[in-house]
Amino acid sequence: MSLVIPEKFQHILRVLNTNIDGRRKIAFAITAIKGVGRRYAHVVLRKADIDLSKRAGELTEDEVERVVTIMQNPRQYKIPDWFLNRQKDVKDGKYSQVLANGLDNKLREDLERLKKIRAHRGLRHFWGLRVRGQHTKTTGRRGRTVGVSKKK
């Protein structure tokens, strides 16, 4: 960052219901949005023709708007399907990139669906146990420890 801050520098940007630190480089700053990782951020910025060495606070309004539209409609900007975080959606079979609040909603809906159809994963979530096949005999214990009293 240069020693002199530009006049139109924004220290905090509000993008997709998320506060973004304007002092960070743009590629890493937009990873604060849920559903946007470093790889996706780089691809979006390349498609939007934005210099990766810029700070987030240096972006103009139309540049921010361009980044948001590309993030929300990645297939229109020729970002491949395998790059997206929601592939072959269970309900409509579409490919999309789910961001911010939509990601929380989709995750909750998926868990509710698994619980409703009484799938093994759904039941494990319901019971509060490990879901991905880990051993649970000794690790992952919660609650108070049960002590053993010594025999006299």
From Swiss-Prot:
Its main location: cytoplasm. It comes from the Eukaryota. Belongs to the universal ribosomal protein uS13 family. This is Small ribosomal subunit protein uS13. Component of the small ribosomal subunit. The ribosome is a large ribonucleoprotein complex responsible for the synthesis of proteins in the cell. One of its GO terms (cellular component) is small ribosomal subunit. Keywords: Cytoplasm, Ribonucleoprotein, Ribosomal protein, RNA-binding, rRNA-binding. The lineage of its organism: Eukaryota, Metazoa, Chordata, Craniata, Vertebrata. Component of the small ribosomal subunit. The keyword Cytoplasm applies. Pfam families: Ribosomal_S13. One of its GO terms (biological process) is translation. One of its GO terms (molecular function) is structural constituent of ribosome. It is found in: Cytoplasm.
